[in-house]
C-alpha cells in the first residue's frame, strides 16, 4: 500500500547510526504500529524485540538474515520476515526506504 490513511505520526524521528538511518513511527486506530524509514548507503546491524515484516519501499537492500551466511537481495516491492529477539544485517549502495510492520 502506498498510502496510509487515518493514522497518527510521531513528529520526532528515530535516528540511528549517526543519522544514516532515520524512521518515523506511524500509529493506527487499532493500536498497531509501523515505522517508515530511510537508509543511507552503508552496512548496518539491527536487533528485533518483536516479530517484524520489512517491506522495501524503494531501492534495494542486501540482507544477512539470522543464522545464515549468504546475503540475500530484496528489491522494491519485496519483503522479508524476522522473528523476535534476533539480529540481522542490511547493506545498500544507494538510498533506500522501508516500511516495518510489527507482528
UniProtKB/Swiss-Prot annotation:
InterPro entries: Ppnp, RmlC-like_jellyroll, RmlC_Cupin_sf. It catalyses: a purine D-ribonucleoside + phosphate = a purine nucleobase + alpha-D-ribose 1-phosphate; adenosine + phosphate = alpha-D-ribose 1-phosphate + adenine; cytidine + phosphate = cytosine + alpha-D-ribose 1-phosphate; guanosine + phosphate = alpha-D-ribose 1-phosphate + guanine. One of its GO terms (cellular component) is cytosol. GO terms for molecular function: guanosine phosphorylase activity; purine-nucleoside phosphorylase activity; thymidine phosphorylase activity; uridine phosphorylase activity. CDD domains: cupin_PpnP-like. Its EC number is 2.4.2.1, 2.4.2.2. Keywords: Glycosyltransferase, Transferase. Catalyzes the phosphorolysis of diverse nucleosides, yielding D-ribose 1-phosphate and the respective free bases. Can use uridine, adenosine, guanosine, cytidine, thymidine, inosine and xanthosine as substrates. Also catalyzes the reverse reactions. Belongs to the nucleoside phosphorylase PpnP family. This is Pyrimidine/purine nucleoside phosphorylase. It comes from Shewanella baltica (strain OS223).
Amino acid at each position: 500500500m502506498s498510502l496510509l490513511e487515518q493514522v497518527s505520526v510521531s513528529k520526532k524521528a528515530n535516528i540511528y547510526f549517526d543519522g544514516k538511518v532515520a524512521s518515523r513511527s506511524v500509529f493506527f486506530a487499532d493500536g498497531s504500529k509501523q515505522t517508515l524509514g530511510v537508509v543511507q548507503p552503508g552496512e548496518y546491524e539491527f536487533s528485533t524485540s518483536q516479530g517484524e515484516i520489512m517491506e522495501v519501499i524503494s531501492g534495494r537492500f542486501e540482507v544477512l538474515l539470522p543464522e545464515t551466511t549468504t546475503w540475500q537481495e530484496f528489491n522494491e516491492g519485496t519483503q522479508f520476515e524476522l522473528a523476535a529477539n534476533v539480529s540481522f544485517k542490511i547493506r545498500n549502495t544507494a538510498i533506500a526506504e522501508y516500511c516495518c510492520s510489527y507482528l
